Amino acid sequence: MSNDSKFFTNQKGDDLASRINELAKYSKSFDVLSGFFYSSGFYQIYKSLEDTDSIRILIGISTNEETFTLINQGNKLQEDKILNEPEVLEKVEDQVESEMQNSDDSKLVEMGVHKFIEWIRSGKLVIKAYPSQNIHAKLYIWTFKEGDREKGTVITGSSNLTQSGLINNLEFNVELKDRNDYEFAKDKFEELWKDSIDVSQKYVETVEE
């Protein structure tokens, strides 16, 4: 891998989307933990993931401005609430509908959505939602193909899986290449993934309604 930079701020050509696309060339799996997710962000990276075997996206469910503001204002009850499965599915449905209706670039969203659905149906991609509304972590984990000199790498920081987070906003993200960092991040992701709710089919149903 030619890019040895550790920090990505979306300035001067070091946007996070470009690094994701570079690392995807070497990856057999890609795991994402993101508080916010929009299909326009997925559009920025999906082409490089064509040869990736497995993609898992774990999202928070506090994905609208109103809820995010409430949490930032210290609404402890809202922050700590654990939702049941029907409530999680309803929130995901609301999020997808809102994006489709309010996106500034509906064509990009549409292209990202079509690929997203295709990969869900093939089993390549699974999206889950964490049932607690206090998850705001951002984590990108690549597991490399066998024979690579490293097992994997991790990027963590401020960027959500959105076009703004990957390209437009001033962000601060760091790549961690140490094996111990990769293993720690992978283990924590697996813990959260196990306790999360599969919303893949709800995503497809909402888009196709």
Feature annotation, model-predicted:
Residues 1-209:
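PLD/PLD-like phosphodiesterase catalytic module centered on the HKD motif
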